[in-house]
Amino acid sequence: MTAITAIAITGMDLTGALRITWVRDNLAHVEDHSHTDETSGTWTGLACPGYGLALGADVDNAVLRDMAAGSELADLIWEAPDVLTAEHAQVFLAAMRAYNTGDSERADRLWEDLRAIWSKAWSANYAVLEFMQGTGLTRFSPVKPQQWVIASFEHHTSPHGLSHPHIHNIVLTALTIGAIAR
């Protein structure tokens, strides 16, 4: 089952699409790209600290596999909007051209620009995850709001991710907890 919804993040001028799918490949897709043509994953879920996982720390794939054992895994895929995709591709290709022609100063500036563009994507992704945990999904737990253990994997620099930048947010549904009222 795949559900798709468009999400607009108020105040960020950034939209995107969020697809919810169920992991059926034993994490092969994210692991195949992690540490090869994309960066490692990042722990992002609000329940992570309760399991000894520092928010923002790199995901150790072996730890993820161990924690995921016996859990249904949801993949909340945040997809960049067309305007961010076009800007990202333009700067990425210019940076590669500068690098390949030996213009390291220009390449460095463009890589910084690319990081700034991609930080918008991460900001939108975090906002969507916070919203979704606040809303909660009944399939994860009847208690709402919720906190999830999430391993987020960005796909935006490999041939696979460059054409349509996105972030895989792998939710270990068995570890869902009710949020503490504030």
Where is each model-derived feature located?
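Intrinsically disordered, flexible peripheral segments
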Residues: 1-182
